[in-house]
Amino acid sequence: MEAADYEVLSVREQLFHDRVRECIISILLFATLYILCHIFLTRFKKPAEFTTVDDEDATVNKIALELCTFTLAVALGAVLLLPFSIISNEVLLSLPRNYYIQWLNGSLIHGLWNLVFLFSNLSLVFLMPFAYFFTESEGFAGSRKGVLGRVYETVVMLILLTLLVLGMVWVASAIVDNDKASRESLYDFWEYYLPYLYSCISFLGVLLLLVCTPLGLARMFSVTGKLLVKPRLLEDLEEQLNCSAFEEAALTRRICNPTSCWLPLDMELLHRQVLALQAQRVLLEKRRKASAWQRNLGYPLAMLCLLVLTGLSVLIVAVHILELLIDEAAMPRGMQDAALGQASFSKLGSFGAIIQVVLIFYLMVSSVVGFYSSPLFGSLRPRWHDTSMTQIIGNCVCLLVLSSALPVFSRTLGLTRFDLLGDFGRFNWLGNFYIVFLYNAAFAGLTTLCLVKTFTAAVRAELIRAFGLDRLPLPVSGFPRASRKKQHQ
C-alpha cells in the first residue's frame, strides 16, 4: 500500500475510534441518568400497584414504570444539555491541548443535542401514550386475557392516535405555511412533520415556562423559608416547647378518657389538633437543635441569594430587550456546527459562564416549583410512596415538556449566547421578532410583578414574626371607638 492509502486508512480509523468513543460516552451518561431516575421513581410509586394479586397488572405497571424512567432520564438530560455545553466550552478554552480531555469536542456535544431531540420526540409521541394506553387497556372483547392482548389493543390505539395527530399537524402546517406544506408529502414525516409537531410542543413548553417561572420565583422564598430555620429575635423556645407538650398531653387525656367530660367531644377534631401540635413540636425541636449561625445567618443569606439571582435574571432579560431593539444578532438562532473552544459565550469569561449555568438551573427549579404550585397542576404533585401510575405518567410528560423547552427558553431570554444546536434551532417561531420581544417583555413584567407583590408581603410578615409582634394582643388602631362600643354592648 502507498503512503496516501495509509493516510486515508488512518483517517478512517480515527473517525471510527471517535465515533465509538462518543457512543460509549453517550451510553454511560444515559445509563447514569436512567439509574438515578429509576431510584427516584421507586420512592414515589405506590407499592400496592406492583405487588397485587393479579400478576398481569403488576407486569403492566412495571413496563410502564420503565418507560416513565426512560422519559424522565431524557428530561434530566435535556436540563443538563445547555449547562454541559457551556461548561465544556470553558474547559476547552482553559485546556485547549490537554490529552485527557480530547474526548470533549464539538462532535460529542452535537451528538448529545441530537440524541436528546430524538428521544424527546420518541417519548412524547410514542412511549408516553403507549404507557398510558397500556395501563388503561384490558384487551379486546373476545380475545385471550393477558399482557399480549393488552399490547395488541395499545398498539391499535396508538396507531389511531398517530393518524389523528398527523392529520392535525398536516392541517395546522397547511394553514400556517400553505406554500411549503403543499410541497410536503407523507413521506417527509420524519424530516418535516415530526419536527413541526415537536416545534408546537416546544412552543407550548416555552409558554408554560413563561407562566410557571415567575410564579415559582415568587414561591421560592416561601419554600426556602419552610426548609430553613427562621430567625426569631424575641422568643423563648423552652417555654413554647413546654406549652406545646402540655397542650398535647391535655388533648391526649381527653381522647383516652372521653367520659371524663360531660360535653360531647369531636374525636376527629381532637386527633387533628394533636397532629398539628406534634408537627409544631417537631419544628420547635428542629429550631432548638439548630446552631446559632443556622438560626441567625442561614435564612437571611438564603433569602439574599434568592433575591440576587432573581434580580440578576430580570436585569439580564431587560438588557436583552434593549439588545433586541438595537442588534439583530441578539435573536435566537440555531447552528449546525458546534464550534467549541474558540471563544467564550460570556463577556465575563469563565465567571460569566458559571453565572449562566447557575441561573439556568435556578430558573428550571423555579419553574418546577411554580408548576406544582399552580392550582391547575397542583393535583399532579407526587406524594411519597402514594403516587399512582397515571400520575407518574402525567408528571413525566409535563417535566419532559418543561425540560425540553429549557434550552430554547434560556436562549430566547438571552441568559446565554450559546446558540441552539441541531433541530432545536429549526423552530420557525424563533425567527419572529415580535414573538421573541413580547416574550422577553412579558417575562420581565410578570417576574417583577410577582416579586413586588409577594416579597413585600413576605418581608413584612417575617419581620413581624421575627420580633414576636404576632403574639402580642395588639388592638385595632384604626377603629378605637367602634371597639369600645362593642365592649360596652
Swiss-Prot record:
Cellular location(s): Cell membrane; Endoplasmic reticulum membrane
InterPro entries, A to Z: LIMR, LMBR1-like_membr_prot
Ranges facing Extracellular side: 1-21, 88-114, 176-196, 327-350, 410-431
Region (Interaction with LGB): 1-59
Membrane topology qualifier: Multi-pass membrane protein
Entry similarity comment: Belongs to the LIMR family.
Annotated keywords: Cell membrane, Endocytosis, Endoplasmic reticulum, Membrane, Receptor, Transmembrane, Transmembrane helix, Wnt signaling pathway
One term under GO cellular component: plasma membrane
Function per UniProt: Plays an essential role in lymphocyte development by negatively regulating the canonical Wnt signaling pathway. In association with UBAC2 and E3 ubiquitin-protein ligase AMFR, promotes the ubiquitin-mediated degradation of CTNNB1 and Wnt receptors FZD6 and LRP6. LMBR1L stabilizes the beta-catenin destruction complex that is required for regulating CTNNB1 levels. Acts as a LCN1 receptor and can mediate its endocytosis.
Tissues expressed in: Highly expressed in the bone marrow, thymus, spleen and lymphocytes.
Protein's UniProt keywords contain Membrane: yes
Subunit-structure text: Dimer. Can also form higher oligomers. Interacts with LCN1; this interaction mediates the endocytosis of LCN1. Interacts with UBAC2, FAF2, VCP, AMFR, ZNRF3, CTNNB1, LRP6, GSK3B, FZD6, DVL2 and RNF43. Interacts with GSK3A. Interaction with LGB and SCGB1A1 is controversial.
GO molecular function per UniProt: transmembrane signaling receptor activity
Transmembrane segments: 22-42, 67-87, 115-135, 155-175, 197-217, 306-326, 351-371, 389-409, 432-452
Biological process terms in GO annotation: hematopoietic stem cell differentiation; negative regulation of canonical Wnt signaling pathway; receptor-mediated endocytosis; T cell apoptotic process; T cell differentiation; T cell proliferation; Wnt signaling pathway
Disruption phenotype: Mice exhibit severely impaired development of all lymphoid lineages, compromised antibody responses to immunization, reduced cytotoxic T-cell killing activity and natural killer (NK) cell function, and resistance to cytomegalovirus infection. T-cells are predisposed to apoptosis and die in response to antigen-specific or homeostatic expansion signals. Impaired differentiation of hematopoietic stem cells into the lymphoid primed multipotent progenitor (LMPP) and common lymphoid progenitor populations that give rise to T-cells, B-cells, and NK cells.
Xref: Pfam families: LMBR1
Cystine pairs: none
Presence of keyword Repeat: no
Region (LCN1-binding): 1-76
Protein name: Protein LMBR1L
Cytoplasmic side: 43-66, 136-154, 218-305, 372-388, 453-489
